[in-house]
Amino acid sequence: MALQQHEPAPFAPQSSLSFTQGFLLGQLSVVLLIGAFIKFFIFGEAPPPPSRGMSNRTTHRRYSSVYSPPQDSQKSLREKPSTSNVLRPVPSTSTNTRSILRKTYYSAIPTNPTSKHGRHRMHHSSHQPESLDWFNVLIAQTIAQYRETAYSLKDSPTSSILSSLTAAMNNPEKKPSFIDKIKVTDISLGEEFPIFSNCRIIAVDDPVSDGGRLQALLDVDLSDDNLSIAVETSMLLNYPKPRSAIIPIALSVSVVRFSGTLCISLIPASTEPPEPLQTPAGSPAPPTSDPRDNAGNRPPGPGEHTASQDELPPKSSPKSNVAFSFLPDYRLDLSVRSLIGSRSRLQDVPKIAQLVEARVHAWFEERVVEPRVQVVGLPDLWPRMGRTGVRPGEDSDAGSTAPPRSAGSTESSGPPRFSDDHGREPEGLRFRGALDSRLGLGAGSRTNSFNVDMGGLRSSSMTRQQSGGARSDHFEMPGAMPAGTPVGTPGIPDN
């Protein structure tokens, strides 16, 4: 009993880790858990490096879950799609003609199986034809701006309507040798505006697009307008020697009335290059929306060098186009006044009037009468800072949101104002000569105009002069701003 009382009690074993060491170990374990969670649940796996030996082998991937779905049933969210499959495909059922008409609540049923040109048409059934009053206002404002622009450029040596028409009609490649220099004596761009009405939507069978394409038909009428052109020239008799005899000729052409049905349709952009249009032998190639293509159609002028295709920058992506034409049942009434001779004069020769009318009708039908159409590229409507501006008189409301102007831009760089010119007749739109007294033309006899083809002379009232002397056949309002004129706020780079 005495030995058991004096025996010492056993001590409890002390921990080998201190409090600080345990705290640090706990923090480290928490950091490791957080890092593992971020790595396996948030971050993705790096793509394996390309290997020639492993290219033909099947790679096995680990799945974090117990259930591994089959590859054919669904795609894993962690798989990155290819660059060609980022944009979701649009089903063809939502882009065809029937789907568009159904979603816009515009139904069309076939009423005429075939048309004059062998195409199947579908006429509207549930909608009454629109009056297009709002469209007439927009077109009238556009034409009025073109007329003001033509007057503002009347003193320009290169961009005026007078210089453009004179250079186009005196083109040595088109004008015959027995015609002397042609001088424009009178130009009138008119005072009235075309009236569009009776708009209807039809569906036309098109083998290129699925379900056909939609086409808008608009009735247009222009009458009692003051649109005309008058020229003076001489017919040369070069036998037995050059300029053996000269016969003065004065000619005035005006349009009494024009009416017809305008067809407008959209042509979607295609990644494939379009096939070149068939043009008659000896005629220039039709212009495209790319100015580099138009420049390549003309011969190099003096001081120019021909650049290879490798030096040109890559072309932009294909754009959608709008095609317009007139149905063959159009009406174009012309008034032709002529005066031939110096001492003994012949006035208003019927044969000359018939020749001029035939050439004008042929010129018009070769370009914009079905089945021929004019194709115009649609502009880029994506908002850009280079084209951003502020309406006049609202600078204070814009405040700091207006884009900054460069130091070189001034107030004079804005659009020209014509407030002082409304009270008087635009002299640039009418060039008077001695033709009025010789032909007896009054103010009411001047209406629409086309330039005259005589022999190989080509009509040019609706053509545009290129920078190198060649002409393109697409329409452009005479006196408009040059194609190279930048549009937008000066001094601001395009983003």
UniProtKB/Swiss-Prot annotation:
Domain SMP-LTD: 128-379
Cytoplasmic side: 44-495
Entry keywords, A to Z: Endoplasmic reticulum, Lipid transport, Lipid-binding, Membrane, Transmembrane, Transmembrane helix, Transport
Organism: Penicillium rubens (strain ATCC 28089 / DSM 1075 / NRRL 1951 / Wisconsin 54-1255) (Penicillium chrysogenum)
Topology Lumenal: residue spans: 1-22
Protein's recorded name: Maintenance of mitochondrial morphology protein 1
Keyword Transport tagged: yes
Subunit structure: Homodimer. Component of the ER-mitochondria encounter structure (ERMES) or MDM complex, composed of mmm1, mdm10, mdm12 and mdm34. A MMM1 homodimer associates with one molecule of mdm12 on each side in a pairwise head-to-tail manner, and the SMP-LTD domains of mmm1 and mdm12 generate a continuous hydrophobic tunnel for phospholipid trafficking.
Start-end of Pro residues biased regions: 271-289
Coiled coil segments of this chain: none
Residue span of region Disordered: 63-94, 269-320, 382-428, 440-495
Gene Ontology MF annotations: lipid binding
Protein function: Component of the ERMES/MDM complex, which serves as a molecular tether to connect the endoplasmic reticulum (ER) and mitochondria. Components of this complex are involved in the control of mitochondrial shape and protein biogenesis, and function in nonvesicular lipid trafficking between the ER and mitochondria. The mdm12-mmm1 subcomplex functions in the major beta-barrel assembly pathway that is responsible for biogenesis of all outer membrane beta-barrel proteins, and acts in a late step after the SAM complex.
Recorded domain comment: The SMP-LTD domain is a barrel-like domain that can bind various types of glycerophospholipids in its interior and mediate their transfer between two adjacent bilayers.
Recorded family membership: Belongs to the MMM1 family.
Gene, per the UniProt record: mmm1
Cell compartment(s), UniProt: Endoplasmic reticulum membrane
Keyword Methyltransferase appears in the UniProt entry: no
Bias type Basic and acidic residues, positions: 418-428
GO cellular component, one term: ERMES complex
Transmembrane segment boundaries: 23-43
